[in-house]
UniProtKB/Swiss-Prot annotation:
The keyword Glycosyltransferase does not apply. The lineage of its organism: Eukaryota, Viridiplantae, Streptophyta, Embryophyta, Tracheophyta. Its main location: plastid. This is Photosystem II CP43 reaction center protein. It comes from Eucalyptus globulus subsp. globulus. The gene is psbC. One of its GO terms (cellular component) is photosystem II. Belongs to the PsbB/PsbC family. PsbC subfamily.
Amino acid sequence: MKTLYSLRRFYPVETLFNGTLAXAGRDQETTGFAWWAGNARLINLSGKLLGAHVAHAGLIVFWAGAMNLFEVAHFVPEKPMYEQGLILLPHLATLGWGVGPGGEVIDTFPYFVSGVLHLISSAVLGFGGIYHALLGPETLEESFPFFGYVWKDRNKMTTILGIHLILLGIGAFLLVFKALYFGGVYDTWAPGGGDVRKITNLTLSPSVIFGYLLKSPFGGEGWIVSVDDLEDIIGGHVWLGSICILGGIWHILTKPFAWARRALVWSGEAYLSYSLAALSVFGFIACCFVWFNNTAYPSEFYGPTGPEASQAQAFTFLVRDQRLGANVGSAQGPTGLGKYLMRSPTGEVIFGGETMRFWDLRAPWLEPLRGPNGLDLSRLKKDIQPWQERRSAEYMTHAPLGSLNSVGGVATEINAVNYVSPRSWLATSHFVLGFFLFVGHLWHAGRARAAAAGFEKGIDRDFEPVLSMTPLN
């Protein structure tokens, strides 16, 4: 099974190093890769590669559990989550655990349970990883043919793809079931400032769900990132879960068509490059989602979005100056435009001043003050509620700006506070990781294509120029 073909033929890159460090079957002589090339040594050792992946999953889940408990231990219920540098508890709160009206945390026990469950799971995964890396069979093909594979076996590869798609679909439906049957999820748009509620009236209309995919990514359109009600989000997960599960069944039952067999490269490194490309796209989309979207990422937990903090500042000073007697409908600003209110290019009444660029912001504390033609002057004069004033003042002072040394706020502000928004961290980290994954995709795709074409660019190490040069010393 292991010697169907010469490994050197398929992995012609030489990595000269001390090959004696590795154990039998994983040394440079048999694999063509030195110890520091990591899992490349395990390309044809399915049992050992399984161990590496299970151990990696254990590390991931251990981080989730340990970081979860760390955040619980440091959590102060009196302060908003976004002031405490939390990135995991906001996700749990968004799922409706431990929070009540207005996003107030009423019970931290579910967060503790989540951390402990992840820690216990990581121990199981860690044991499985060590077992398969050190004790289990090197290859699975002989003893467990269902779990064995050859990278070139196109039918087996699409079967594995199908299994993965079904698991992803089940994951999407877990969110659907949580929202429908198990206590609901947090809805920032619930009247009076947000609350946990069960989603009863799902959006299943394909024109609505797939309409998001057809929207422009620019301006007030915002592609799928513009989704702003939970019915659409949960309905989208029903569609996505169904497509993943049906697609998974399809890939398990069918063999790749001739055009796919010809068009794609069928090797382990090619599959790695495809996966890295997909993860890169996920990273870039997640970056935009957490930066702009305050429905999937409620501002009560993640802090305001950039546009939201800016509009909140305009609103706060409109409230203040209106109380002091200013006529906010007609006051002129220094540029001759309205100081507090002006018209957008399409005629809606919007906030004036620098925040005009964010005129298409939608936020639950602001929408009740809009009429059919933008902000409603009579509502601004009579209907502003104390909770809207409090929330906008809070958001105004917590813009998602900040430097790496955690001095938050506008860089020129002398009263800057020690605050960096989780939105900043999550958006920048996902952008950077998405970029790294994209570079990894290019790298591995190039190597996979070169190997498939039967050539390999590199230095002929038997005749390196440096070998004939005078030693430096």
